Amino acid sequence: MSNKAEATNQSSFFNLHVEGVGYLNRVRRVKPKKGQEFLACTVSAMRGSTDDIAYTKFDCKVSGAEAQKIVKMLEADVAAEKTVIIGFKIADIYPEMFTFEKGDRKGELGVSIKGRLL
């Protein structure tokens, strides 16, 4: 019975984390209309065979203290278009629809995978 009582008194969360290795891109500061400015980036995660690597892009808000420190440290290298590979952990991923505003796909719908870089 004590386990049931303990479970009732504790907050429960379902955590979804993605861990891997990928390229760090598009380091930027985002200024929303409401709320505070935050650091963001794109991670192109590598997956599949090393002979035929595929990539999945994640658009991330940089949340973790260590992630903030590391991304800020690597920001100049990303801006200089150097290849920057990182180990990462992304939490709370979700899809977000958007409309392409320019290029060959202008007006088409797309999907971005959002998350928090820890």
Language-model segments: residues:
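Single-stranded nucleic acid-binding surfaces, predominantly the OB-fold ssDNA-binding core
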Residues: 1-118
